[in-house]
Amino acid sequence: MKAVIPVAGAGTKLRPLTYTQPKALIPIAGKTILSHIVDQLSEAGITEFIFIVGYLGEKIQDYVKQTYPNLTTHFVYQNERQGTGHAVELTKQLIGDEPIFVALGDTICEFDVKEIIDSPDSMIGIRKVDDPRDFGVATIDENGFIEHLVEKPAIPKSNMALVGLYKINETAVLFECLQQLFVENITTRGEYNLTDALACMIQKGTRFRSFKVANWFDCGKKESILETNATLLKKMGGHVPAADIYKDTIIIHPVSIAAGCTISNAIIGPHVAIGPNTTITQSIIRDSIIGGYTNLHEVVLDNSLIGSDASVKGLSRSLNIGDNTEIDFG
C-alpha cells in the first residue's frame, strides 16, 4: 500500500510564517506537521509515499529526503491549485490499480493506523463536529458504512465530518470517477474535490466503511496550531535534552526544547515548543511555538508563533512573525 499526501497548499491563513516555508513544515510539539503524519503511517508499515507538492515544494522535497532517507518517496507537482481531487489524479501513473492511503497534509489525527490498513474494507475517517458546513459530510448506515458524501453542504444531513483520511482499495474506480469530474466539470466552490469522486464511487457500488478518529487536530490557522501544540505536548509529555543546562531558568512542563538551545534567566512553559539552536535570555514564554536559530531577549510572549532565524527584543505581547525577522522594541 502506498501513502498519498497532498501538501501543495499555500497556507495563506498562516502568513507571515508561510511566506518562507510550506504549512506542512511548521513545527508542532517538537516536530513538523508533515512528520507527525509520515511517522504515524511509516510506523504502521507503509514504506512508500507520494507527496503532491506545489507552493515551496522544493523545501518539502529537501526535508523529506533528508529526514526519511530509508523511505521510498515520490514527488508530484500540482502547479495549479484545483482541489484535492485534481491533486490525487496527478498520482495516477505512480499508483496504477494499487490500494492507497490518502492523508491530507494539514491535519493530525489520532487513530489505529495498523487496524485500518489491515482491514479488508475501503475506509474513510470521520469525526463528529458541531458545525460541519466547512467539511465533507458523511451519512452513515446502522452498520457503519457510508451511504452518502457531500462536500461542504449548506444544509448538512449529519454532523459527521470527513477528517482527511481515506483508505481506497478500488483505485481503478477512483480514477474513473475523477475523470468523470473533469469531463462533466463537477466542482465544489470552484475546485475538483476528492469527496465528490468518492461520492461517485459509492454511486457505482463501492462500499466504504467509516472509522472514527480519537482526536482530530486542525492545523490551518494560528489559534488551532497553538491549541494542537498544547494538546500534543500534554499527551506526549514534551522533551528537554538532558545534556543541556539552562542557567537560572524555570521550566514549566509540558515543554519541548530541541538540541543546541541556550536559555538563561527565563521562565519557559507551559505548552512551549522551541526549535534547535535558539537563544532565549531574560524572557517569559508561554503557550507558544518558537522556531530554530532564533534569538529572544527581554520578551514576554503568550500565544505566539515565531519563525526560524528571527530576533525579538524588548516586547510583551502575542506575536505571529515569520522567518528571518528582526524586531527590537528597546
Describe these PLM feature segments.
Residues 25, 138-140, 210:
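A structural signal for short hydrophobic beta-strand segments in well-ordered beta-sheet cores
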Residues 50-54, 126, 289, 305:
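Short internal beta-strands
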Residues 11-16, 133:
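Short N-terminal binding/cap micro-motifs at the start of the first secondary-structure element
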Residues 108-185:
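Conserved core of the sugar-phosphate nucleotidyltransferase
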Residues 10, 106-107:
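Active-site metal-binding loops of divalent metal-dependent hydrolases
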Residues 2-5, 13, 27, 31-103, ...:
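Conserved N-terminal catalytic core of the sugar/cofactor nucleotidyltransferase
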Residues 180-330:
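Left-handed beta-helix
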